[in-house]
Amino acid sequence: MFKRSIIQQSRLFSNSASRLGKKVFFDPAVNGTKIGRIEFELYDNVVPKTAENFRALCTGEKGWGYKGVPFHRIIPDFMIQGGDTDLTNGFGGKSIYGSKFADENFVKKHDKAGLLSMANAGPNTNGSQFFITTVPCPWLDGKHVVFGEVTKGMDIVKAIESYGTASGKPRAEIVIEEAGEL
């Protein structure tokens, strides 16, 4: 009985370990001063195409990515948004699949702070822009694809949020100085 229990626990651990998503990071800076690291785990078992887009943009392996890109929209008690790899002002950005790609699914919900979700201009318009929730945002369910979550550095997300305004225009220049895969 004891041996069987250990084997069952071992299987549970190995199954959950195999479901862990890829891990990526940002090292953001405020007005040129690095403020720490944000680490994410991607839901590549739920939304593999969306997660791969973000991972590849973190590494810059396609020739462009998030390094040097600002958080251009920050609204306290809502979210921080970035990822405009073209224009850097919120009006650009492209995916690794071309200009835009379709919403993969809406399985994951905006039910807590620290979620990574695709910013878009309506259905099936995902590019490179993303946001990180700072509170639960259930009104976004079914409209934006959740594809990962913050695993370390939520204090850094909250620090970035503190530079936000009701209009979304940041009160400081906040840039992703480094990004990559862990």
UniProtKB/Swiss-Prot annotation:
Transmembrane segments: none annotated. It is found in: Mitochondrion matrix. Pfam families: Pro_isomerase. Residues 1-20 form a transit peptide. One of its GO terms (molecular function) is cyclosporin A binding. Keywords: Isomerase, Mitochondrion, Rotamase, Transit peptide. It is an enzyme of class 5 (isomerase). Residues 25-181 form the PPIase cyclophilin-type domain. The keyword Lyase does not apply. Inhibited by the immunosuppressant drug cyclosporin A and by SDZ NIM811, a PPIase inhibitor. InterPro entries: Cyclophilin-like_dom_sf, Cyclophilin-type_PPIase, Cyclophilin-type_PPIase_CS, Cyclophilin-type_PPIase_dom. Its EC number is 5.2.1.8. One of its GO terms (biological process) is apoptotic process. Disulfide bonds: none annotated. It comes from the Eukaryota. It catalyses: [protein]-peptidylproline (omega=180) = [protein]-peptidylproline (omega=0). One of its GO terms (cellular component) is cytoplasm. Present with 1960 molecules/cell in log phase SD medium. PPIases accelerate the folding of proteins. It catalyzes the cis-trans isomerization of proline imidic peptide bonds in oligopeptides. This isozyme is required for growth on lactate at high temperature. Belongs to the cyclophilin-type PPIase family. This is Peptidyl-prolyl cis-trans isomerase C, mitochondrial. It comes from Saccharomyces cerevisiae (strain ATCC 204508 / S288c).
